[in-house]
Amino acid sequence: MIDTTLPLTDIHRHLDGNIRPQTILELGRQYNISLPAQSLETLIPHVQVIANEPDLVSFLTKLDWGVKVLASLDACRRVAFENIEDAARNGLHYVELRFSPGYMAMAHQLPVAGVVEAVIDGVREGCRTFGVQAKLIGIMSRTFGEAACQQELEAFLAHRDQITALDLAGDELGFPGSLFLSHFNRARDAGWHITVHAGEAAGPESIWQAIRELGAERIGHGVKAIEDRALMDFLAEQQIGIESCLTSNIQTSTVADLAAHPLKTFLEHGIRASINTDDPGVQGVDIIHEYTVAAPAAGLSREQIRQAQINGLEMAFLSAEEKRALREKVAAK
């Protein structure tokens, strides 16, 4: 189902949601951190989704053990490097890794700006080692409030040339986008792209707000757009992309099952929607699974899957020249 003549991308992938269970175990031992299990087999149910979670917030608790072992900046650097290694193993040509430095720093009071620098270093070294092209998206974790998001924003701005875009993630219902208008004004002033988690836990009005008030060029998840025909028309006309994460939306109980997922309808409507993983380490999936298992189960035809793959590059926060070069590089292999 994957067209090997086209670049394979993953543009909605959380770096801090892709910490290997084995790495959690090793860092726990290295830093003498008490874990809920002492073997890989018994740890996995604590750090990966085994059965679907009742809601998004419950799903997010599965991420916590991964960041609890980030006891140093070296640990942050390691997981960033391993994220690129995992991308290479999955056959990805281009990946956009998003991360919340405040969330990564929280358990051990690491300096937030130091976490940003460590992630940049780890990703840069990973790209050199494995030949994957990557860009970084900074996440503000709305769940922790406006002041914490301001601290994350300042840390990103200190490394503005290494950050490609700003995102807002976390508790969408409890912390609406209207609380963060000034944050996104500064992000746009910095020349960054904007993508926002919206229409996952909240309804289509959250997507409208992300576009109109925060300046979103892409929407993370966006499943609730299906409830608003005018919004779907607008997304298609304005080429505002939807970063679909099929398995994730089932595991968070955002969508009942893959057959009910709106991605197929989005593509039929002419919306620029792509296939992505979200939190592969927590979900126990990879991009290959999303293309070969999840997408067919969601009713996508072979041609629709190919279109979603094309959309992944078209939606990417790359220049037209960078996209052309990547297409040519893959086609030449």
Curated annotation (Swiss-Prot):
Descriptive protein name: Adenosine deaminase
Keywords: Hydrolase, Metal-binding, Nucleotide metabolism, Zinc
NCBIfam families, A to Z: aden_deam, PRK09358.1-1
GO cellular component term of the entry, any: cytosol
Protein family per UniProt: Belongs to the metallo-dependent hydrolases superfamily. Adenosine and AMP deaminases family. Adenosine deaminase subfamily.
Cofactor remark: Binds 1 zinc ion per subunit.
Gene3D superfamilies in UniProt: Metal-dependent hydrolases
Annotated EC: 3.5.4.4
GO molecular function: 2'-deoxyadenosine deaminase activity; adenosine deaminase activity; zinc ion binding
Pfam families: A_deaminase (PF00962)
Residues at the site labelled Important for catalytic activity: 221
Species, as recorded: Escherichia coli O1:K1 / APEC
Residue sites binding substrate per the record: 14, 16, 170, 279
Catalytic residue positions: 200
Cofactor: Zn(2+)
EC class of the enzyme, as a word: hydrolase
Catalysed reaction, written as an equation: adenosine + H2O + H(+) = inosine + NH4(+); 2'-deoxyadenosine + H2O + H(+) = 2'-deoxyinosine + NH4(+)
Domain of life where this protein originates: Bacteria
Residues engaged in binding Zn(2+): 12, 14, 197, 278
Protein function: Catalyzes the hydrolytic deamination of adenosine and 2-deoxyadenosine.
GO process annotations (BP): adenosine catabolic process; hypoxanthine salvage; inosine biosynthetic process; nucleotide metabolic process; purine ribonucleoside monophosphate biosynthetic process
